[in-house]
Amino acid sequence: MDNLKLLEEAKKARLKAYTPYSNFKVGAALLTKSGKVYLGCNIENATYTPTNCAERTAFFKAVSEGEREFEKIAIVGAKDGEDANEMCAPCGVCRQVMMEFCNPKEFQIILADGENTCRVMTLEEL
């Protein structure tokens, strides 16, 4: 799947985010090496500690379905009502989850960088 198409999937996932506290909605689309795409959105909680990021939601869905090999992830984020066209990098906890399951030299992270453009980097480069 091409990077811009994967970003479009992440934008769809972002629409399902539950963010009553920050109003910052994030979507992620995780492509497995088997070709399946798993979507995730951020899900907030009033105490913040149990809040789950979009990236981890996508990974946990995939792992719970038996996936263990991943190719790349597209991530988008913005305030509710805004276009998700600016870079939104994964937090440290999400990076650690990626390190657990992915080769940092190969796993690609795709971030929106404009309406129809993106930046691509490996987990190691991030």
Q: What is the predicted role of each segment?
A:
Residues 42-56:
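Compact, glycine-rich, soluble single-domain proteins
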Residues 9-12, 54-62:
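Short, well-ordered amphipathic alpha-helical segments that serve as non-catalytic structural scaffolds
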Residues 23-31:
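Short beta-strand scaffold segments in enzyme catalytic cores
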Residues 19-21:
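Short Gly/Pro-enriched turn/cap motifs at secondary-structure boundaries
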Residues 2-16, 67-126:
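C-terminal binding/interaction regions
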Residues 31-32, 112:
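Short beta-strand-to-turn element immediately C-terminal to the catalytic PLP-Schiff-base lysine
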Residues 31, 61-67:
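Alpha-helix C-terminal capping segments
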